[in-house]
Amino acid sequence: IRDRAGLVGAQRTELMEGIFGLRAHTSGKVWIKGQEVHIKQPRDAIQHSVALLTEDRRATGIMGVLSVADNISIASLDALRKGPIMLDDKKILELVATNKEKMAIKVPSPKTAIKSLSGGNQQKVLIARWLANNPDVLILDEPTRGIDVGAKYEIYCIIAELAKQGKSIIMISSEMSEIIGMSNRVMVMCDGRITGFIDGKDATQENIMALATQFETAPEAAAANQ
């Protein structure tokens, strides 16, 4: 599990969106399993077995008017087709049932609108959406934001289990306890630049914050330069 730490404005999300193909980039390379890959759009990322759980699940994650089944299956429609146009409803229901049990999603029916679920269950549905594609790299941007303590623990367990299965987890978190408790290695950013790496066993609030504020200008120094 690799964490991307930094203060608001460090551009951690922008970096991950660039890797996933949501943002254009003019420099840098992406390597997966020792091979350079070229990602210009999300479809390229998905083909290279990369998934992205976005920061704001309501704005860019869930499709609120659609059902839980639709939200889980939307990223893997090619595998769920029955012919060139039709979808295989049986496969979709099997996919939903498997993930409902695996992720402990509390939902009365696959046809339930996702907007009626709790924040924690919505987040688990979104994780299930990407796991249906069996990604090798899973980018999680603020995976426990806005959910209760019980749901946080469940998602921590899911993340830990995915790491045990050999998935590469890249996590962005603004919670210091989450960064220190979950990460094997922490990359710290400040003002769009990487300021350092810290092994998980050595990560403390003090050394993370020192790197996260490395390029910040003191108010008095900024005033003197005006």
Kindly give the residue locations of the regions a language model identified.
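Glycine-rich phosphate-binding loops of nucleotide-dependent enzymes
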Residues: 1-226
